[in-house]
């Protein structure tokens, strides 16, 4: 079978591997679509905090069940599914409290362990979710939506909250979509105006703030909020400058959610946290309930996830997909590979 591998930063190769052999309690899956996550792109660029090499990327995917044992989840061969790619130990303090997304030994596919970008993989049955008739392309987008949705849930967003999402990549846009679904007034900010405007127009967001300078950014924040700033700010980039922007744009008593993953350290005036009495939340991975709730939400027709896909490549074009995405990240929103 064919497998995509990142040998080192900037080097993607398609290699031949033996078919995986499933163990008891696992299913054999045929991968149908895989989305290139920002962390996969970071691994390709050498900027992802958890990257090691060589690495098979991919944790956003859909698949067809080829072989599976009898199970109590009603999963059968031929079903189109998606999966939870965050492997937890089940024994640490976090896992014991049900916070499996915060497992101290977490291994996410494509990051701490090899990912799904092969023609076939095996997967523990308990990590497989029935796609309920959603298309294979849509199901490959459920996992990034879960990342955003989990972060939004941390903020306890209320109807008419003023929300600012910084970062118009996949996670940021889907965070905006999730906040909008909760009745909030949602604005998005980015340095790439075309990408920002695409998100606003495609998903009916309330507006945008071009982050071309700190001064212009704050001026627009004040104009939009009548000087009151935002009830919720969401960092979906992973840079020190955008973290600072979230703090600066937050109202007194606001909630700030950190979803973006970065590699850099940052010095900032921490007294702003005290002065504004900010509630700052980290958000990591997602939970089973996020997957189940979002599959149902998308199935209801309230959200069209496929609108986020701007580019689709075939498996044999994997190297080109990574090259193009790396060079054109300012204009390419979600890139998927058809297997």
Where are these regions (language model features)?
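Glycine-rich beta-strand-centered segment in the early N-terminal region that forms part
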Residues: 20-34, 47-93, 132-134
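NAD(P)H dinucleotide-binding glycine-rich loop of Rossmann-like/cofactor-binding domains
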Residues: 89-166
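Mid-domain Rossmann-like dinucleotide-binding core that forms the NAD(H)/NADP(H) cofactor-binding site
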Residues: 134-213
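Glycine-rich cofactor phosphate-binding loops and adjacent beta1-alpha1 units
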Residues: 201-279
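C-terminal hydrophobic helical "lid"/dimerization subdomain
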Residues: 244-248, 288-339
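Rossmann-fold dehydrogenase core element
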Residues: 255, 268-307
